[in-house]
Amino acid sequence: MPYYYGYGFGIDPLYLLVVLVCTVLGLAAQNYINSTYKTWSKVRSDGDTGATVARRMLDASGCNVVGIKGVAGELTDHYNPQDNNLYLSDANRSGGSVASVAVACHEAGHAAQRQSGYAMMKVRTALVPVVNFTQNTWTIVLLLGLFMNIAGLTTLALIFFSFSVLFQLVTLPVEIDASRRAVAYIEQSGMSSKQVNGAKKVLTAAALTYVAAALTSIIQLLYLMARYSRNSNR
C-alpha cells in the first residue's frame, strides 16, 4: 500500500518487496495444492465416493446429525458449524478418487472437532465475528489516521489487522488437526498404503496454503508496524 510522507504519498521499495514475497508465497502454495489435487484425483480410492466415506467418518465420530450438501466450484469444500453441514464440491462429493476422499474426510474432521469440543476450533469460531468486522474496516481506519495525522487511529488500524493475523495463526492447528483426524480414519478404512500416502500428500498440500496465508499476514503486519514506527519517529 502507499505510505504517507506527511504531505503526500510515495512508493516504498520495501513495500514492493513485501508484495512480491507475499504474491510468490500465495501462488506457490496454490499451484502446489492444485497440482497435487489434480494428480491424486486421477487415482481411485476403494470405489466409494467422497460423500460416502465422509458420511461413515461422521457417524463413527458421533456426528450423525451433520448433513452433507453440494457446493459449486472447485476446492470450495468446507464445514459450516452454524448449520452443521459439510459442503462438498461436486468433484469431491460424487467422485471416488483419493483426492476426493481426502478432502471430504478433512471437512468431516472439522465436524468431529466440534463434536469433541476441540478448544482451538472454539477459539477460531469466537474470532469469526470480530475478524469479519476488523478486516473490513482496518484499511479505512488506517487511511483516516494517515490523512488526518491521528496516531491513535493508525494504532487502532494495526490492532484491527492484528486480529486477522491471530485468526490465521489459530486456523493452522485447526486445519492440521482436521487433517490428522482424516488420515487416522482413512488409514483404518481399508485403503492401500499408496492411497493413504496420496491422501496425506493432498492434505499436506492443503495445509501449506494455510501456512502461506499465515506467513503473508505476519509479513504484512511486520511491515505496517515498521512503517508506522518509522513515521512516528519523524
Q: Could you describe each region identified by the protein language model?
A:
Residues 113-119, 141-152:
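Membrane-helix exit/interface motif
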Residues 2-9, 13, 30-132, 166-219, ...:
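Polar-ligand-bearing catalytic/cofactor-coordination segments
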Residues 9-18, 150-159:
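Hydrophobic alpha-helical transmembrane segments
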Residues 18-22, 164:
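Alpha-helical transmembrane segments of integral membrane proteins
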Residues 21-31:
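N-terminal signal-anchor/start-transfer transmembrane helix
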Residues 133-143, 216:
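Core segments of transmembrane alpha-helices
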